[in-house]
Amino acid sequence: MAKTIVHENESIDDALRRFKRSVSRSGTLQEYRKREFYEKPSVRRKLKSEAARKRRHY
């Protein structure tokens, strides 16, 4: 979990910017979006093979 301590004489905008940067670096939001809806293992394998096929094609 990302934590941000707001320092003295620091604006909320700067603290929010630091928080967003730490969340994006830790991958928290990406992990949330990946797990938002359950995917059956068969669907996950199918998507993975389609992505590999797209990478090979280009």
From Swiss-Prot:
GO molecular function: structural constituent of ribosome
Keyword Ribosomal protein: yes
A single GO cellular-component term on record: ribonucleoprotein complex
Alphabetized InterPro entries for the sequence: Ribosomal_bS21, Ribosomal_bS21_CS, Ribosomal_bS21_sf
Superkingdom, taxonomy of origin: Bacteria
Biological processes per GO annotation: translation
UniProtKB keywords: Ribonucleoprotein, Ribosomal protein
Family statement: Belongs to the bacterial ribosomal protein bS21 family.
Protein name: Small ribosomal subunit protein bS21
Originating species: Lactobacillus delbrueckii subsp. bulgaricus (strain ATCC 11842 / DSM 20081 / BCRC 10696 / JCM 1002 / NBRC 13953 / NCIMB 11778 / NCTC 12712 / WDCM 00102 / Lb 14)
